[in-house]
Amino acid sequence: MNGTEGPNFYVPMSNKTGIVRSPFEYPQYYLAEPWKYSVLAAYMFLLILLGLPINFMTLYVTIQHKKLRTPLNYILLNLAFANHFMVLCGFTITMYTSLHGYFVFGQTGCYFEGFFATLGGEIALWSLVVLAIERYIVVCKPMSNFRFGENHAMMGVAFTWIMALACAVPPLFGWSRYIPEGMQCSCGVDYYTLKPEVNNESFVIYMFVVHFLIPLIIISFCYGRLVCTVKEAAAQQQESATTQKAEKEVTRMVVIMVIFFLICWVPYAYVAFYIFTHQGSEFGPIFMTVPAFFAKSSAIYNPVIYIMLNKQFRNCMITTLCCGKNPFGDEDASSAATSKTEATSVSTSQVSPA
């Protein structure tokens, strides 16, 4: 074995030299130089510095402006809450443990951090799935005159929490477990061992299929159909400037959504799956740490992509920051012009971009 497995941890280094120690009790500077842990702490501080105000403003502005309290924005609000949740309950702990070079809060703290980080990430992921389904139903109209209302939005929010809990709770009760990963200063699901005592193999397969592959397939299908529908609408009315503009906006949004989803999560999922399917192979702590920490940046990308590119929301945020006045123009007029976000149907001459 090229790693050292303990009762509640797995350190990616052989203990032939006798230097491996529990990541809950001793600094892990034999895995990486101290400055690398400082870099991780600085990176987490940056995510906290950016993530807290962005996601807080998203929540605050939506609460302050009634025009933003639309069914679709309930999902966006849930997404921002999940990101804020990740920053407060996950990133702050990871920054502190990185400064110390090991997981100073013990096994209980590891389960706490692993649970809340997983829960927040899964809420965000399934919120993106619900958004994709909503956009598909509204734009592609597979169910004729279906109208996405408040009840549907609340059901969507409840669905994201149910799916997130279905992923984050089992390790707390003996189906898999949370352990320190990579450089041993943050916790996640155990991809490193088969651990038959906790049926780890079956949980990892369940997690990859249900909580990664299926969401990816749904998102890809929905936005793929959305692009095709918009192009068809544009082709039927070449003279319509509104349709042409909507096509460009939708295409841009879809490209950004899919690319950043893949950038954030595929490297982490690939490395985790590689480690799990190559038990006993040699890999360094950096191999898992870099993609794991990079995936955390989704808490910053999500509000920027899904909300900051929303013109109506951006106008409301500017108005809030400028004490009730929009120095860049008439907020009401601008909001009316961009109220396509609230659209729940697609006519032959207009396609709702977001």
From Swiss-Prot:
Positions where N6-(retinylidene)lysine occurs in the chain: K296
Site positions (Plays an important role in the conformation switch to the active conformation): E113
Lipidated sites in chain (S-palmitoyl cysteine): C322, C323
Family designation: Belongs to the G-protein coupled receptor 1 family. Opsin subfamily.
GO biological process assignments: absorption of visible light; G protein-coupled opsin signaling pathway; visual perception
Subcellular localization, as worded in the UniProt entry: Membrane; Cell projection, Cilium, Photoreceptor outer segment
Recorded GO MF terms: 11-cis retinal binding; G protein-coupled photoreceptor activity
Gene: RHO
Disulfide bonds listed in the record: C110-C187
Organism this protein belongs to: Aquarana catesbeiana
InterPro entries membership: GPCR_opsins, GPCR_Rhodpsn, GPCR_Rhodpsn_7TM, Opsin, Retinal_BS, Rhodopsin, Rhodopsin_N
Higher taxonomy: Eukaryota, Metazoa, Chordata, Craniata, Vertebrata
Taxonomy, superkingdom: Eukaryota
Topology in the lipid bilayer: Multi-pass membrane protein
Name of the molecule in the record: Rhodopsin
